[in-house]
Amino acid sequence: AEMLAFQALVRDAASRDARRFLLAGKVEDMLNTVVRQIAFHNFETKFHEARRSGELSSEDMSDIWMETQTAALGPAIRLDDDYRPVWAYIPHFVHTPFYVYAYAFGDCLVNALWQSYQTRAEDDRQMFVNDYRGLLMAGGTKRYDEALAPFGLDATKSSFWHLGLDMIADMIAELEEL
């Protein structure tokens, strides 16, 4: 529903600048959700692996943090020493370990569902809406593979993830054209 509302806002934007503003905000949000949360997950994985060999100091944790964040952000972003302790400010690592992947999964899922809706024939869209309502009504009663089956989506296949990531790439391309 959020993507439907967003697409309507973009479609009905009063000007190019308004459209650019909306797209830029959405792209930034999606990149933060997907790239940042995956980097957080990589940090958690590495520090738990390192912890198997013994206790880690805050310096060890900061080294792992900088390694994973630098790898995720690439050479365009330079992280200084002030960024080293940032891991300690993120409550997920303590209160809900290994939860952050859900943000990236959720964002890619929304994008994949939207792409699935967009590629359907007009007369098939009502079936999608019915399936989507069924997904929402099921709540957490179904495994993700069962819940996504009516949409022809399989989160174990790379094509699922590409649907979500390609949508981000498409928005970036649209933004660059503006």
Predicted regions and their residues:
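Structural signature of FAD isoalloxazine-binding scaffolds in flavoprotein oxidoreductases
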Residues: 1
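C-terminal, non-catalytic "cap/extension" segments appended to globular domains
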Residues: 4-17, 33, 37, 41, ...
